[in-house]
Amino acid sequence: MRQFLLFILFALLPFTAIAQCRYTNTWQDFLNDNWKTEEGRVELVPSAKEDCLAMDVEADKKKTAKMLRKTACVIEWGGSLYLNLRPFNTFGDVFVQAWRIGGDKVLFARQDVAPSRFSIANGDTGIPLSRSSFRSLSKLENLVCYLAAWDPQREELRIARVTAAIVAKFLAGHPAQLSQYQQLERGQREQADIVITTLQAAGVI
C-alpha cells in the first residue's frame, strides 16, 4: 500500500495541470511566507527519467527559467514544495520535492553521501552523477533523507542526514507510529520511502 501511494504521488507530478507557481529567493523569505510569482507559464517537469525525484524548471520565457534555476531557494508548485539543490554543490543541479518539518526545516530525499561532502557554495564541485548514480536514484528505497535548516552562526543553509534516532524524535508525540517504526528492521529505518511515509502517517510532514 505504501509503495502504491508513493507511486501515485510521483507518477502524477508531470501530469498536474498548469498550476500556480510561486517561489522565494532566500530561506528567511520562505520561513516568513514571503513568496514571489512570475507572469506566464512556470512549471516543474521531471529532469531525468532515471531520477525519481529530480525536477527542472520550464517557463514561457527562457530568462525566467534560468533565473529560477539560479536564484530560487524554494518553489511551490502544484501544492508541493521543491528545494533547489544547486547551492549545496553535492546532490546535482536540480530541484527535488521537499516537506516542511518542525517549522523551520525542510526534509528531502537524495543519495547517501558522506558528511564530508556536505558543501554549501564553498567551491566544491560536488558529486558527479554517473550512470550508476542515476540507477541508485531511480527508486526511493535506494535513497535516504536529509534535513535542510538555516545555521544562524554561519549564516548559511546547512544539511544533516536523517538517522533513525532523528525520526524517533519526530515521532515522540505519536506512539502508534513510533511503535510500528521501531519494529522495522534496522536496515530499513533510514530508507527514504520508510521515513517519508512514516512521517506522513503521523502528520509530521
Where is each model-derived feature located?
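Generic hydrophobic-segment detector
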Residues: 7, 68-69, 193, 205
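Generic low-complexity, intrinsically disordered sequence content enriched
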Residues: 9-17, 35, 48, 57, ...
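C-terminal partner/receptor-binding element of secreted or periplasmic proteins
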Residues: 165-205
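Bacterial Sec-dependent N-terminal signal peptides
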Residues: 1-23, 195
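Aromatic-patch recognition
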Residues: 22-177
